[in-house]
């Protein structure tokens, strides 16, 4: 018989407690299994949110049956963490006897690794061997994201189909992003792309998206018609995911409101070296306000004939003041062939001729004080400032006024009330990059002035080239005309250069919501290679020496296509020069390319044939047009205006892009590039 023990209570009495129950409880607890936390089983078809260290540790501790699963999860984590060499090593060490589920995951990881390494051709091939029907929902998201990544943002039917297939698998912000990216891809389709599309009869969602794009393209120049068109489309395609949740940009269209231009504050430097440029802009602004448009004749106020060599006013390079880019002073215009009509019809500005305009002098007061004064004066829109140092201050401004700046900072910030319109060499270089790319050239060489001016041009060209999908851009600095003459006697120009070092860093890749950092670049760029195109930023006197040297340095088979900026286009060039330039293409604003000869005649006479000031006069005209379409530029993606300085569209951040006409010297004449 078990003995009893006595426990003394607070009251002082002893209470017997049987040991039987205590011992029984102890024996029961001793027999219970351990309650230590259990490692959840590896599920390669689900999320893999833990660190690679955790999965690698489980790999070491697991039995042979689970090792491959943990290894696959570790590879996925290594990819997410940007540890691409380690991921590749683990992928190569996978056992050969994988199950069918493991083999599919291995293929998907291989494709994701190839995407991360930018081996897009290999990734596309790997993805083509994966049966999407065998994938889980989580794997499908990754599968379609990899398909999207291999297209590198280039609009195509496979890219759009991948977005559409991915959409039902997403929720919340990821779902909205999917709709926005689908829409952006559709907007990138060219008319040629649209005409060549072949879709299946059962692709109802794709058909709905394409019809929405047609509605947008047909009505984007009229906000009211566009609103009605979108609502009608929603009624016709009620089951389309975009009908239930519009892309962000189209949702903004439904809430579009026109901006007031009843009182405009024009901020310009009225004193100092930049005054001559400000005067030209102001005259163009007022001319457009009074009814002069790029496409309508003007009343001649000057003699019809212009002396071939008029005296030139002393003109300071506006770039020195951070203003705008122009070419050197020019002589009388040559007769150029009429360029082909732009695809965008000219926009008639709203009836704002009665708008009140007040000019404020940025050379006399700080920008912040002028903005405050303009607001107190009742201004509803600000046009300007012009000088770059003033434009740089806009980012820190607290003004709520709509501002059309006449220049742009190095890195424009996206402010909801600011647009940037610059007649800059960088803007022209970006247009040149797009033009050369459209002509199927892929290995450009830039011949640019040495120094800060040339560096800015090279950086702008290269950044646009990378956006288009281009690779290395070479640059070579050029000196004065006298230096170039010496080069003629010492072997001429070499068709090589140094890679531009301002290329953007490799971008990270996002797969299934996980951002994989870009791998470090360890491939040295080359300075030679086959150059197929040359973009020349030079004066006419420099170009007279450069082109013949290129012709002599290359044979007819390897001769690169040659392009020049407006800097080289000066009026009054004789037939010998035009014959020497045979085949060379160059860009300039529509006004100087022959879009309105009567307006050009008047402007040239007014500024004594100084094309630098004629360009600024044209800029002032377009500033008036943009002022009257400020809200459209800010809120309607794809909205276009055909102006005197180019076809104007708004890029992200409301940076106004200009598409310029391109001309070519052919048999002693100047004709549009076909």
Swiss-Prot record:
<keyword id="KW-0998">Cell outer membrane</keyword>
<feature type="compositionally biased region" description="Polar residues">
    <location>
        <begin position="316"/>
        <end position="328"/>
    </location>
</feature>
<keyword id="KW-0449">Lipoprotein</keyword>
<comment type="similarity">
    <text>Belongs to the LpoA family.</text>
</comment>
<dbReference type="Pfam" id="PF04348">
    <property type="entry name" value="LppC"/>
</dbReference>
<keyword id="KW-0133">Cell shape</keyword>
<keyword id="KW-0564">Palmitate</keyword>
<feature type="lipid moiety-binding region" description="N-palmitoyl cysteine">
    <location>
        <position position="32"/>
    </location>
</feature>
<dbReference type="InterPro" id="IPR028082">
    <property type="entry name" value="Peripla_BP_I"/>
</dbReference>
<feature type="compositionally biased region" description="Low complexity">
    <location>
        <begin position="331"/>
        <end position="349"/>
    </location>
</feature>
<dbReference type="InterPro" id="IPR011990">
    <property type="entry name" value="TPR-like_helical_dom_sf"/>
</dbReference>
<keyword id="KW-0732">Signal</keyword>
<dbReference type="InterPro" id="IPR007443">
    <property type="entry name" value="LpoA"/>
</dbReference>
<dbReference type="GO" id="GO:0008360">
    <property type="term" value="P:regulation of cell shape"/>
</dbReference>
<protein>
    <recommendedName>
        <fullName>Penicillin-binding protein activator LpoA</fullName>
    </recommendedName>
</protein>
<dbReference type="GO" id="GO:0031241">
    <property type="term" value="C:periplasmic side of cell outer membrane"/>
</dbReference>
<dbReference type="GO" id="GO:0009252">
    <property type="term" value="P:peptidoglycan biosynthetic process"/>
</dbReference>
<feature type="signal peptide">
    <location>
        <begin position="1"/>
        <end position="31"/>
    </location>
</feature>
<feature type="lipid moiety-binding region" description="S-diacylglycerol cysteine">
    <location>
        <position position="32"/>
    </location>
</feature>
<comment type="function">
    <text>Regulator of peptidoglycan synthesis that is essential for the function of penicillin-binding protein 1A (PBP1a).</text>
</comment>
<keyword id="KW-0573">Peptidoglycan synthesis</keyword>
<feature type="region of interest" description="Disordered">
    <location>
        <begin position="291"/>
        <end position="349"/>
    </location>
</feature>
<keyword id="KW-0472">Membrane</keyword>
<feature type="compositionally biased region" description="Low complexity">
    <location>
        <begin position="292"/>
        <end position="315"/>
    </location>
</feature>
<comment type="subunit">
    <text>Interacts with PBP1a.</text>
</comment>
<dbReference type="GO" id="GO:0030234">
    <property type="term" value="F:enzyme regulator activity"/>
</dbReference>
């Amino acid at each position: 018989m078990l003995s009893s023990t006595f426990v003394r209570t607070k009251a002082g009495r002893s209470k017997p407690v049987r040991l039987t129950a205590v011992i029984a409880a102890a024996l029961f607890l001793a027999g219970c299994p351990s309650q230590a936390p259990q490692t959840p089983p590896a599920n390669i078809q689900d999320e893999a949110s833990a660190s690679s260290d955790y999965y690698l540790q489980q790999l070491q501790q697991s039995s042979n049956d689970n090792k491959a699963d943990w290894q696959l999860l570790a590879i996925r984590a290594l990819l997410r963490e940007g540890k691409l060499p380690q991921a590749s090593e683990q992928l190569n060490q996978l056992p050969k006897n994988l199950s069918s589920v493991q083999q599919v995951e291995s293929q998907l990881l291989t494709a994701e690794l190839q995407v991360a390494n930018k081996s897009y051709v290999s990734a596309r091939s790997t993805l083509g061997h994966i049966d999407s029907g065998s994938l889980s929902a989580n794997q499908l998201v990754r599968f379609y994201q990899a398909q999207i990544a291999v297209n590198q943002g280039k609009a195509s039917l496979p890219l759009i189909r991948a977005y559409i297939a991915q959409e039902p698998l997403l929720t919340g912000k990821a779902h909205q992003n999917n709709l926005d990216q689908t829409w952006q891809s559709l907007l990138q389709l060219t008319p040629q792309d649209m005409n060549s599309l072949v879709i299946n009869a059962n692709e109802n969602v794709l058909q709905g998206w394409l019809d929405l794009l047609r509605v947008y393209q047909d009505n984007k120049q009229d906000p009211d018609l566009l609103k009605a068109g979108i609502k009608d489309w929603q009624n016709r395609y009620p089951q389309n995911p975009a009908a239930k949740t519009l892309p962000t940009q189209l949702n903004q269209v439904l809430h579009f409101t026109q901006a007031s231009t009843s009182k405009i504050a024009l901020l310009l430097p009225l004193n100092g070296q930049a005054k001559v440029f400000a005067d030209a802009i102001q005259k163009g602004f007022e001319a457009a306000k009074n009814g002069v448009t790029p496409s309508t004749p003007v009343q001649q106020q000057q003699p019809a004939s212009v002396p071939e060599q008029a005296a030139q006013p002393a003109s300071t390079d506006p770039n020195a003041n951070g203003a705008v880019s122009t070419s050197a002073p020019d002589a009388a215009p040559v007769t150029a062939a009429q360029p082909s009509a732009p695809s965008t019809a000219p926009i008639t500005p709203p009836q704002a001729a009665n708008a009140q305009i007040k000019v404020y002098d940025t050379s006399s007061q700080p920008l912040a004080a002028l903005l405050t004064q303009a607001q107190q004066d009742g201004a509803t829109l600000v046009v300007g400032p012009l000088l770059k140092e003033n434009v740089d201050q806009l980012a820190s401004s607290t003004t709520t006024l709509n501002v059309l700046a006449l220049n742009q900072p190095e890195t424009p910030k996206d402010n909801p009330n600011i647009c940037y319109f610059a007649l800059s060499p960088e803007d022209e270089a970006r247009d040149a990059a797009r033009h050369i790319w459209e002509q199927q050239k892929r290995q450009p060489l830039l011949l640019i002035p040495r120094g800060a001016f040339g560096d800015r041009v090279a950086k702008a060209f290269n950044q646009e080239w990378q956006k288009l999908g281009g690779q290395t851009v070479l640059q070579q600095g050029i000196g004065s005309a006298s230096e170039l003459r010496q080069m003629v006697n010492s072997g001429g120009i070499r068709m090589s250069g140094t890679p531009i070092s301002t290329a953007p860093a490799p971008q990270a890749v996002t797969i299934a919501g996980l951002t994989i950092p870009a791998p470090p670049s360890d491939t040295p760029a080359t300075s030679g290679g086959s150059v197929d195109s040359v973009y020349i930023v030079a004066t006419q006197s420099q170009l007279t020496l450069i082109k013949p040297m290129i012709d002599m340095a290359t044979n007819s088979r390897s001769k690169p296509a040659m392009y020049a900026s407006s800097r080289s286009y000066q009026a009054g060039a004789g037939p010998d020069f035009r014959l020497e330039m045979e085949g060379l293409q160059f860009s300039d604003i529509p006004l100087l390319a022959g879009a309105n000869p009567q307006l050009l005649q008047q402007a040239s006479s007014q500024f004594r044939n100084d094309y630098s000031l004629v360009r600024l006069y044209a800029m002032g005209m377009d500033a008036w047009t943009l002022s009257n379409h400020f809200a459209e530029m800010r809120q309607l993606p794809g909205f276009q205006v055909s102006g005197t300085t180019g076809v104007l569209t708004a890029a992200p951040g409301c940076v106004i892009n200009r598409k310029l006409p391109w001309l070519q010297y052919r048999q002693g004449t100047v004709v549009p590039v076909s």
